[in-house]
Amino acid sequence: MKVREAGSSKFDLMSLGECMIRLSPPGHGRIEFSPTLEVWVGGGEYNVAYALARLGMRTGFLSRLVDNPVAHIILNHARSAGVDVGHVVMAKYDGVGRADRIGLNFTEVGTGVRASVTMYDRGHSAASNIKPGMIDFRKAFSEQGCRWLHTGGIFSALSDGCAATVKDALTAAKEAGTIVSYDLNFRSKLWNSQKAQQVTKELVPHIDCLIGNEEDFQKVLGFEVEGVDEHLSALDTRAYKKMVEKVVKAYPNVKVVGTTLREVKSGLVNNWSAILWHEGTFYESRRYDGLEIEDRVGGGDGFSSGFAYGFLTGKSPQECVDLGAAHGALLQTTRGDTSQIDLEELTHVFKGGSARIKR
């Protein structure tokens, strides 16, 4: 897969999606019993632009927010890492949020036998009200230049306007020679499988890199994976590989398929690894067995960030999947959806470094 050389464009990567405010009880508390809530910033697509900015890449965010102090939390968060927000459309705030608002999610971090839980409060958000033409994609991709566009199924699921906007973005990106990655990211609270397949099958012909776990490919593209239990807690990689071969046969434009492999032992202990298909060959990452987790939300976005960083910096496919797995593992050691990892830490773990204290 050929990626534009560094320095050929204003942006190494841009993400298109919604960014929300996440409210979480401290520790492993319950929402209904917590007198205080921590404020975090995150969104499935935004998280990738933020992570790569922390790794030294030139990134930008494409979205729509409403112009009020809550949105400024998001803008300040992006700017703090160097994420360009010049293509974020700001809607006028009506003082109440009847027309546009900032999406919220309430997330409990599970432990033991109790799973993590996310409750959405994102209806009628500014991002979900986006329409084609609100963002000038040709300016971003053709005039300013962008090497890589990342978006995904969470944003496409929010509304018909979001799905149409994603299609416009993918069309403009391909016309400009921009690599497109798309995280299938199925969320049953946002849409059903039938609608997901209807929308996504129109998008895949414009996509270079597909990211998704076994459930994503089943629910979003209709491909079955043999050997998965009803709780989706274990996966036979041989069955996954067979499914990927069907995917790339159906969509020959797809050059990369990647996923994380998570086996849940408890709310805070998982076995973690990743697998990548690149132009006919499969690559498997180092395994992180018994990975101790602080907060699993955003782990998949961490993988997407790491492998995109690898391709953008000219690494081999094996190095790309190892970078993705390492970054995803590291991201889950901290609270919040977005990366708190720098390039030195990523390189240390990617090269097999241990958690021995550094003095």
Task: Give each language-model segment a name.
Residues 267, 283-353:
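Conserved post-catalytic alpha-helical subdomain immediately downstream of the catalytic base
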Residues 135, 163-168, 194-201:
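Charged helix-capping and loop-helix junction motifs
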Residues 177-184:
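Short beta-strand/loop segments at the ligand-binding rim of alpha/beta enzyme cores
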Residues 40, 47-59, 80, 310-313:
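Alpha-helix C-terminal capping segments
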Residues 28-50:
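Short catalytic helix/loop segments, enriched in acidic residues and glycine
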Residues 58, 62-153, 346-359:
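Conserved N-terminal subdomain of the carbohydrate kinase-like
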